Amino acid sequence: HELADILDDVIDVINRCGQKVLLYSPQKLNKNSALLVDIIYKGCIEVQHAVTELQNLKKTDTQLRSHCREIKRLEEEADGIYETAIMSLFKEETSSVELIKMKEITQELEKAVNKINSTGKVIKSILVKYA
């Protein structure tokens, strides 16, 4: 039940990311936003593999742990990118309106990465409980 809830949360926050991009229509998406989107994609792939491997929990213990570690590593990488993105926005963006738009979008992207990381934690707790 907890896994289904967190997966639903991941989908919701990724959907909100797209909605904010469409709603705010920023003049451009910066390099850091693209890097965060790439991390979200990679994190979702790791979650997909981990959820698939939950079906054979006893046989895939090592692979599951590896996926959970990779999800955590991606989240840590995203933290650095997020900090750089926010600093760059305040340093380089001259339009207050664009700054607010990109700050909101970047924060939502970071939330998506954090939800994916939470999914990894739930998967790891299932692994500990049933392995």
Please tell me what each predicted stretch does.
Residues H1-A131:
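Cytosolic, long alpha-helical scaffolding segments
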